[in-house]
Amino acid sequence: MNFKQYSPEELKECSMIEVVHSVLGDKRQATTFNELVQEIAQVLGLSQEQVNAKLAQFYTDLNIDGRFINLGENRWGLRSWYPYEQIDEEILPQPKPKKKRKVEEDGFDDYIEEDEDDFDDADGNADEEDDVEDLDKVLEEEDGDDDDLDDLEEDEEDDFAEEELEYDETEEEEEEL
């Protein structure tokens, strides 16, 4: 787009985005943001104060408009110049492969729950009768524990009775004095 053919009034009606699009189209190469701003100011006849006032909105418009692409390092170009596959290659930095750490062996085998089941029953036959017998033994032991508790309670009662007698005897002796 040749800007010389437009009158100053017509140029003032053009948006900064339209001017950038035509400038990049004429140059046919990526340009830094600062160079684009300088060319816009020159074409539109804007002062530095006017450019500074519109700079934030211009940058936002440049990012939002789908016709432009940021190529990194503050360089801008037209999206139509780059096929989709090339955009990914040029824009995205290639990730560096991460170094793998060596895993130190602790010398212990990993615990496998399946192995535990193999040692539960030596003859290979897991009978429910064995489980019932084990439960019976546990219950018998618990019954025996109750007898022990009864014996303890009786002993404590006997001790208490003896202490009570001793106390009564001591009281009688004190009264006599």
Swiss-Prot record:
GO MF terms, alphabetically ordered: DNA-directed RNA polymerase activity
Extent of Acidic residues compositional bias: 106-177
GO terms (BP aspect): DNA-templated transcription; regulation of DNA-templated transcription
Domain HTH HARE-type positions: 14-81
Region ranges (Disordered): 91-177
Highest taxon of source: Bacteria
Presence of keyword Nucleotidyltransferase: yes
Keywords for the protein's UniProt record, in alphabetical order: DNA-directed RNA polymerase, Nucleotidyltransferase, Transcription, Transferase
Subunit structure: RNAP is composed of a core of 2 alpha, a beta and a beta' subunits. The core is associated with a delta subunit and one of several sigma factors.
Role noted for this protein: Participates in both the initiation and recycling phases of transcription. In the presence of the delta subunit, RNAP displays an increased specificity of transcription, a decreased affinity for nucleic acids, and an increased efficiency of RNA synthesis because of enhanced recycling.
Record protein name field: Probable DNA-directed RNA polymerase subunit delta
Gene assigned in the entry: rpoE
